[in-house]
Amino acid sequence: MISICCSRFSCILFLLFLIFSLVLSYIWWSPTKGGTNPEVLPVVLWHGMGDTCCVPFSLGAIMNLIVEQTKGGYVRSLQIGGNVLIDWQSGFFIHPNEQVDYVCKQLLQDEHLAKGYHAIGFSQGGQFLRAVAERCPNPPMRNLITLGGQHQGIFGLPMCPTLTEKPCDYITRLLDNAAYAPEVQKALVQATYWHDPIMENKYRLGSTFLADINNELFINKFYIENLQKLKKFVMVQFLNDTIVQPKESQWFQYYTTGQNKVIQPFTESKVYQDLGLDKMHRQGQLVFLGVEGDHLAISKAWFIQNIVPLLLEK
């Protein structure tokens, strides 16, 4: 009975969110802001799961903050599809490859971005923007900043620590057994970056997104060359994250193959060389930032101190 009540309550909250968002879409909704200061590079944002491009209390507030701190810089928050509902659904039900292709075309058509731009990805938007950097070098991305991105994927459920060990493990294994089925890969975004460290071959062969952008199927030199064109690749890990499991995936780390307890050092991972991260590391292009707090829990002061200076770079 409790779970049913919680489910109903969640549904009511979601419906209220959609109604509120639809109302806002006719009042304040704008995927672009600023543009009066040509001296700073434009900024592109990609929201995370369960969010949309422009809600005033979410990415809309981030847009306003960036415009303020860059004194009128152009900001584009990516909206997938033509309205708020499609944009929200994209976080769950539109395959990342389709979304990345759509975004690449949109960015190419935006004349504000022709000379380059900085990019900030929130949660899964982080690895989606990395795919843009790898697949679509024009217009050129300068600094890529990922806040809580899952660059090595996930192997756990949101808020799973609130469950006891047995049901948590059972649900996780149930998802894993179905995650790589073609119909699930096609239908559920999160399945495309579900990374089973115990059955690596199953992951590599079944993943239709993450295994590709991490060069785990074959070495795509085009991806390496494009990623290395970044001035900086900044990865922010939330040190008390209860959503992303393992949280170290935010720093491109993951479990050592064959188990799901011990984290392999970044420099010892296969992707470190296969994606050309070793060269970027040696040249100082990789930046690792840690922030105390749960998933995407950052303050305005922290953002201004740590992220804004990166957006002011040429």
Curated annotation (Swiss-Prot):
It is an enzyme of class 3 (hydrolase). Its main location: other. It catalyses: S-hexadecanoyl-L-cysteinyl-[protein] + H2O = L-cysteinyl-[protein] + hexadecanoate + H(+). Ubiquitously expressed. GO terms for biological process: determination of adult lifespan; endocytosis; nervous system development; neuron fate specification; positive regulation of synaptic vesicle endocytosis; regulation of axon guidance. Its EC number is 3.1.2.22. InterPro entries: AB_hydrolase_fold, Palm_thioest. GO terms for cellular component: extracellular region; lysosome. The active site is at S123, D241, H295. It is found in: Lysosome. It comes from the Eukaryota. Residues 1-25 form the signal peptide. Keywords: Disulfide bond, Glycoprotein, Hydrolase, Lysosome, Signal. The keyword Electron transport does not apply. Belongs to the palmitoyl-protein thioesterase family. Flies deficient in Ppt1 are viable and fertile, but accumulate abnormal autofluorescent storage material in the adult central nervous system and have a shorter life span. This is Palmitoyl-protein thioesterase 1. The gene is Ppt1.
